[in-house]
Amino acid sequence: MSKPCRRPTRAGLREERGNKRRQEKALNAKRCAMGPRPPAPAPLPNRCSTFATLAEEREAREDAVSQQTRLLRKELPALLGQLEQIPDPRDPRKRQHKLTVLLLWGLLMFVFQFASRRESNREMTRPQFLANLHLLFPEIETLPHADTLYRLLRDIDLTHLEQAHVDLVRRLIRGKSVRRYLINHCHPIAIDGSQKLAGDTLWAEELLQRSVGKDETRQTQYFVYVLEASLAFHNGLVIPLLSEFLEHALGDTEAQKQDCELRAFARLSDRLKTRFPRLPILLLLDGLYANGPVMQRCWRAHWQFMIVLKNQDLPSVWQEFHALQALKPQALQRNWGRRRQHFTWVNDIDYAFGSNRRQHLKLHVVVCEESWERVDQQAQIVTQTARHAWLSSQPLSRENVHERCNLGARHRWGIEAGFLVEKHQGYHYEHAFALDWNAMRGYHLLMRLAHVFNTLARFTRQLRDLFRQFGVRGAIRFIRTSCAAPWLDSARMRGLLAEPFLLQLE
């Protein structure tokens, strides 16, 4: 006798979908009764083209290209002025392109999200693309071969390129465009590491190494690892700031230890303090940095911090937290979006560390336990829970716990979302572009600088509707294809580009 079929019937599937819709409707009504919710990002529209005529499409493409170009050209004078200070190592008798034109071309290669030097060679040197680039950027009269940029990046000092990036962010901060997104009057900067690429060839002595595989298949792998710093605001705006490459020789050679993320953090924090000596900063760090030397370095730099505290880290701090919480509980319950949150915190916990535990810090610990409801695959409303804990440099209170935790510490994920974008959404973070250490770093810095410009374009009011209509990659593709085809009318574009541009972030 055959077993009964467990596959649901068409009627059963229809009934299950109906039950799920009813449960979701009831759950949404319950959420609305709890109070206002933060607006969720609207999904991309699934519809046919909104352009009814060729003239409408041409006008939309010209407007999009002009707005993006005006944003770039607003910063180009200062940017190119700094890049002109880079000593040019090339033979003056053989130079066909100015150093600034080469670096501008490299920047545009990443702004338009070309995947490789070969693709940028093939696409950007087409006559129509070149004519449009010259219309948008008169500095570009002819385009070089991509290998020319490679040879330049291989030989130049990249300090000026990095400084140009930092000064761009500094002008943005001074312009007060991000003031309403500050946390306790501090600029939230997330720091995290990411692997850039890995392989079995030692093509540069700076590469880190590790053993991969088991027993018979065990082999040495060489890889590039970068510690990144980015401004991470609670509205989703993430602005790349600094990059620190880990190098094999910068480790402890006597103990035969290569470079690590904590050593790189010490170097990156020194550079951050040098570049922004008086900027109020709130560092957002993961659990790796929950240790005495890192927190002491933050105190000496006069920085605030919010650091993830895992259950297995700092047992003495956890022991004192539980003891003091029982004696003098401090708590707050609130709704945040779809989540019900319960905060508990303890201030002024003494933490001893270092040789013979002679060094002391006053820490403040906050724990957030939250729950939310969702509809599962069986059309049942289920409750899910999560628990988060952080170390804070400042005392917690009912007035600041939401801002420091929900709007600050939780948005450390912004830098991880930035890694996702740079790796899988057009910037090709994991592509070396050159098997030369200095050139590879140069391409990386150009990529991060291009990411800044595209991020500003996404959040500026002038291009808001374009990015909402097409999405981020779709909008960049729309602008790129507009430059690659005869869409742009020279007379109208010159008029549009002559208009002043005011950066207004959403």
Model-derived features with residue positions:
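Short amphipathic alpha-helical "interface-anchor" segments enriched in bulky aromatics
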Residues: 399-434
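Electropositive, glycine- and tryptophan-enriched low-complexity nucleic-acid-binding patches
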Residues: 213-280
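Short, conserved catalytic/metal-binding motifs centered on acidic residues
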Residues: 105, 120-121, 145, 149, ...
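Active-site-proximal, Lys/Arg-enriched surface segment
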Residues: 150-235
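An anionic, glycine-rich sequence signature occurring as long contiguous blocks
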Residues: 3-10, 18, 308-412
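A short, flexible helix-boundary coil/loop motif
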Residues: 2-4, 59-63, 83-86, 125-128, ...
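Charged, often Cys/His-bearing segments associated with DNA-binding zinc-finger transcription factors
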Residues: 2-82, 93, 485-496
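Basic, short loop/linker segments at the boundary and entry of helix-turn-helix/winged-helix-like folds
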Residues: 69, 73-104, 138, 150
